[in-house]
Amino acid sequence: MGPQPPDESGVTWMFTKILVAIEDFDQSQNALELVKNVATDGTQVRALHLRERELSGYRWYSRESSSEAALVADAAVFEFRMAGLAAGGGVRHAVVDRVAEGILAEAREWDADLIVLGSPRRGEVIARLFGSVTQRVLQRSSCPVIVAPRQARGRQEELAAASSPRDHG
């Protein structure tokens, strides 16, 4: 069906199928919150965790076990369902440095009309040398992509410290 355009009342786009790529549950909180704020009644949400694998010799290795990967997706699905959203999720295997292709394939197969990603974790130098997952998804996606900002570490504490009187001795 695809996203619904604004109507004459100025209502913004409404997405019916949102795919959110979850790399790490704790680091993806801003992406999860963004999805909960964008989703409306009837929106379906799919949490996708890509389990990266690499070939070493004649064997495939992964940085995480199958159960660890499933927990990441399951935790996101649980959070979406607690917010009243129709949610499902899963784990997809991807070769290291082919994660973007895994996200895009899932979006195509599921017919997502919005992809939500967290901010990249790679450093700027690494991203320039090898490219970033976020950059590749943005360049190749056939549907809109939203990149949620990184979670502000200790932002409340920073604000409290900035507003408290200082001892200037």
How would you label these PLM feature ranges?
Residues 41, 133, 141-142:
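Short, structured coil segments at secondary-structure junctions
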Residues 47-74, 98, 154-169:
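Acidic, proline/glycine-rich short linear motifs
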Residues 2-13, 81-115, 153-162, 166-169:
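Structural beta-alpha unit
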Residues 140-155:
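Short, flexible loop segments at boundaries between secondary-structure elements
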